[in-house]
């Protein structure tokens, strides 16, 4: 079973590390090519392209300028420990043991606009380059064309390494669009999380993101390897709804308090 999640815009390079172990990202040649393109952008162009403030644009222009592929713990941090968004609040890696990290390293992948695919212990320098931005490059008009089949091929390699064919999609639509389902040598299962609001169940982005992280944590902490085991997920009041699930979708709901 392979789990994919989205990265986060918010980064943390300050908190204490839960491990000193690290690995190197496997697609850095592609990252370096993208950095070369990103360095051609002025801070004003970055602000416009990413729809961010001038201050953030300046920070990210500096990050592009400072980036170099020789990662070490002195200039980079393990991806699972560097991302700090809603998904990662749900993952709550602060209490992960080395055994948890071993399982995560084998079964969890983070999709990334700059790095393509990251394993939990892969070092990464700070960046902001969302998969959905329309950055034209030497391979096409956006990052989906840049990555092409590369991300899917990399996930196929990970699935083959564990002798499995189940991919659990806990990523956002923006990021999962970088995966080509027809080329994926596996079955895609997508958990969906709905919260009750004013008597109706709907996907509420903030809660859904956190729930995706909690599901990833549940799989890692309990060493789950079969799809049917996921139906037991009940963190924070979510419950499995069999009649609204099918072969490709697992529906979870949470009632209003």
UniProtKB/Swiss-Prot annotation:
It comes from the Bacteria. GO terms for biological process: response to hydroperoxide. One of its GO terms (cellular component) is cytosol. Signal peptide: none annotated. NCBIfam families: PRK02101.1-1 (NF002541), PRK02101.1-3 (NF002542). PANTHER family: PEROXIDE STRESS RESISTANCE PROTEIN YAAA, PEROXIDE STRESS RESPONSE PROTEIN YAAA. Belongs to the UPF0246 family. HAMAP family: UPF0246. This is UPF0246 protein AHA_3667. It comes from Aeromonas hydrophila subsp. hydrophila (strain ATCC 7966 / DSM 30187 / BCRC 13018 / CCUG 14551 / JCM 1027 / KCTC 2358 / NCIMB 9240 / NCTC 8049).
């Amino acid at each position: 079973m392979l789990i994919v999640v989205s990265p986060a815009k918010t980064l943390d390079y300050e908190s204490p590390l839960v491990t000193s172990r690290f690995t190197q990202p496997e697609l850095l040649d592609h990252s370096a090519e993208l950095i070369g393109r990103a360095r051609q952008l002025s801070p004003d162009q970055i602000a416009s392209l990413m729809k961010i403030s001038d201050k953030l644009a300046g920070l990210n222009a500096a990050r592009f300028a400072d980036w170099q592929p020789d990662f070490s713990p002195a200039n980079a941090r393990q991806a699972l420990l560097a991302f700090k968004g809603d998904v990662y609040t749900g993952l709550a890696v602060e209490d992960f043991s080395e055994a948890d990290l071993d399982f995560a390293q084998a079964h969890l992948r983070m999709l990334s606009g700059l790095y393509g695919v990251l394993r939990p212990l892969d070092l990464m320098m700070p960046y902001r380059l969302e998969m959905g931005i329309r950055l034209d490059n030497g391979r096409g008009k956006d990052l989906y064309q840049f990555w092409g089949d590369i991300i899917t091929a990399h996930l196929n390699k990970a699935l083959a390494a564990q002798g499995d064919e189940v991919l659990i999609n806990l990523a956002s639509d923006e990021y999962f669009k970088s995966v080509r389902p027809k080329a994926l040598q596996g079955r895609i299962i997508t958990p969906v999380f709905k919260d009750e609001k004013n008597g109706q169940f709907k996907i509420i982005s903030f809660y859904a993101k956190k729930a995706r992280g909690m599901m990833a944590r549940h799989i890692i902490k309990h060493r789950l390897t079969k799809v049917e085991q996921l139906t037991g997920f009940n963190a924070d009041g979510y419950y499995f709804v069999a009649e609204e699930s099918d072969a490709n979708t697992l529906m979870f709901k949470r009632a209003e308090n």
